[in-house]
Amino acid sequence: MAIEFKRSPKPTIGVEWEIALVDPESRDLAPRAAEVLEIVAERHPEVHLEGEFLQNTVELVTGICDTVPEAVAELDRALAAVQEAATELGLRPWTSGSHPFSDFRENPVSKKGSYDEIIARTQYWGNQMLIWGIHVHVGISHEDRVWPIINALVTNYPHLLALSASSPAWDGLDTGYASNRTMLYQQLPTAGLPYQFQSWDEWVSYMADQDKSGVINHTGSMHFDIRPASKWGTIEVRIADSTSNLRELSAIAALTHCLVVHYDRMIDRGEQLPTLQPWHVAENKWRAARYGLDAEIIISRDTDEAMVQDELRRLVDRLTPLAAELGCLRELDLVLEIIERGGGYERQRRAYQRTGTWIAAVDLACDELNELRPLEAE
C-alpha cells in the first residue's frame, strides 16, 4: 500500500472550525445545517463550508494560508456569513467542546455512507458524538519529518488541550472535567492518541494492515488526535476543543503553528526532538482533560512534573522570536491572556453557578461567538 504525501514547500497553515446551530428559545441543537450551507453557498460562494457528522453542524474551512492572521480573517468572514444565514432562519450559531444538555437521540447524523458505517460499527458511543473541535493543519516539506514532529507534538498535548478546554458539562451534569469531549472522542476505535511510529514506512505498513483488516473500510480513515494529512501535505492537529470565540481560536492556531515549525527547524539543525514515554503522554492527556489549566503535567522522560500554566508561559517566551517571524506574535501572546482570564470551561461553570441552569452557558457561548471574544455571563 503506497501513501503519497503531497509535500508542502512552506509551513503554511489551514484551520477547520466546527460550529453548531441552536434554537434561541430552547437553546437545544437544531439539525438545520443543510439550510445554512445552501444559503451561504448561494450568497457567499467564496466562503468554504462543509457539512459535518451531525446535521446541526457546519465546518468553517480556510484555504492554504501563509500566516495565522490570514487564516483568522478567513474564518471571520465565514462566521459572518453563517451568522447571517442562521439569523434569517431564526437560529443562533453556537460552539463549544460539547453541548451541556442536548440529547443525542434528538440529533440525527448526516446522510453519508461513511457516517452510517461509523454508527453501525460503534453503536452507542458513535451516537454520543455531540462534540466539536478545532483542527489545525501545518505544511510539512517531506514525509520523513512527519512522525518525528508528531512524536514531539504529543509532548505538548496538555498545553493545547488545557488552553482550549470548553466542555465541562454533559447531559445536564457537571462532569468534573475541563474537557469531557476528550474523554468521549477516544471511545471511537480509530480515535485517540497516535502511536509513536518511528518512520513514514512504519505508518504506511500500519495503514496497509488497517486496510487489510477492514478497519479503514468501516471508518474511512484514522481519526487520531494528531495525524498526517497526506492529501494536503500537512500534519493535522485535532487536540483542541472548539473555542466559543475567534480570539481564543487564534491563540490555539498560533501556538500550534509555532510548535510545528519549531520542531521542523530542530530537524534542520540536527537537534534531537523531545519525546515522552507513551504512558506519560496518556497521563498528560487525562490530566489536562480533567483539570484544564490547573493540571500538573509530566515534562520529561524522567517523570519530572510542572504546572501546565508555568510550562505555557515558558513556551510562549521560547517561541516569541519564531512567532514574530511567522507573523503571529499578537496571537501567540493571547495564550497568556487565556491563562490570566481562565479557560472556556471555567466561564461556562461560572455561568451555571450564577443561574443554576446550563442554558446560561449556551447563551454565553453564542454571545462570545457573535462578539468574537471571551465574555462573562451577566
Swiss-Prot record:
NCBIfam families: gshA_cyan_rel (TIGR02050), PRK13517.1-2 (NF010042), PRK13517.1-4 (NF010044). GO terms for biological process: modified amino acid biosynthetic process. Its EC number is 6.3.2.2. It comes from Corynebacterium efficiens (strain DSM 44549 / YS-314 / AJ 12310 / JCM 11189 / NBRC 100395). It catalyses: L-cysteine + L-glutamate + ATP = gamma-L-glutamyl-L-cysteine + ADP + phosphate + H(+). PANTHER family: GLUTAMATE--CYSTEINE LIGASE 2-RELATED. Coiled coil: none annotated. The keyword Ligase applies. ATP-dependent carboxylate-amine ligase which exhibits weak glutamate--cysteine ligase activity. The keyword Nucleotide-binding applies. Pfam families: GCS2 (PF04107). This is Putative glutamate--cysteine ligase 2-1. Belongs to the glutamate--cysteine ligase type 2 family. YbdK subfamily. Keywords: ATP-binding, Ligase, Nucleotide-binding. One of its GO terms (molecular function) is glutamate-cysteine ligase activity.
